A protein has these predicted regions:
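Pre-Walker A (Motif I) flank of P-loop NTPase domains
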Residues: 2-6, 76
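Hydrophobic anchor at the beta1->P-loop junction of P-loop NTPases
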Residues: 9
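P-loop (Walker A) phosphate-binding loop of NTP-binding proteins
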Residues: 12
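Conserved substrate/cofactor phosphate-moiety recognition/catalytic segment
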Residues: 15, 19-69, 73
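Conserved beta-strand scaffold positions in the cores of enzyme catalytic domains, especially
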Residues: 32-34, 106-110, 151-155
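Glycine-rich phosphate-binding loop used to anchor ATP phosphates in small-molecule kinases
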Residues: 56-103
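Conserved phosphate-donor/acceptor-positioning beta-strand/loop module used by diverse small-molecule
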Residues: 101-121
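Small-molecule kinase domains that catalyze NTP-dependent phosphoryl transfer to phosphate-bearing small molecules
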Residues: 124-168
């Protein structure tokens, strides 16, 4: 059985990852399931998150990668809507994710948005705090090998990939 493609959308909150997910899921020529930090975080009780946020979030993020791997192993395409941050519970995050998904077709997509725009989006949304994107940017994993970079100015800029990501055309 051919493995499904995994597309990892990596970026700070309010960069536009979920909007990209919605656009991809609206297409009729390719089908993707979605796993996301926000969805998996909801599996953790609030009291546990208050007690030790990164411990429990770290565990569920790793489970999310195993879930994406399962979809791919079953021949299903899947999008990961997340952010690669280096925090206790997941560090070394980027390396752990690569190890879990090493045998699966993986494209890492940097979803870039200027932090001042993210800040304004956070304010407008009201469900994020104003500086959340800046704080996440400081924690992002370094040295990530992206397949593509998506940003609001140039729409799409290829950096490197073994197979073109035609889903973004």
């Amino acid at each position: 059985m051919e493995k499904g493609r995994i597309v990892y959308l990596n970026g700070v909150t309010s960069a536009g990852k979920t909007s990209i997910v919605e656009a991809l899921q609206a297409r009729r020529d390719v089908f993707f399931y979605v796993v996301a930090n926000d969805l998996f975080q909801e599996t953790i009780g609030e009291d546990y998150l208050k007690e030790n946020y990164w411990k429990y979030l770290g565990e569920v993020i790793i489970m999310m990668y195993h879930t994406a791997k399962l979809f791919s192993d079953l021949g299903k395409n899947v999008i990961i809507d997340s952010i690669l941050v280096e925090r206790e519970g997941v560090a070394p995050h980027y390396e752990r994710m690569k190890e879990i998904l090493r045998d699966n077709p993986l494209d890492l997509v940097e979803v870039y948005c200027p932090l001042d725009i993210c800040r304004q989006r956070n304010i407008d949304r009201g469900d994020r705090y104003e500086t959340q994107s800046e704080e996440q940017a400081k924690l992002m994993s370094a040295g990530i090998q992206y397949s593509l970079r998506v940003d609001p100015k140039s729409r799409l800029m290829r950096t490197q990939t073994t197979q073109p990501l035609t889903i973004f055309s």
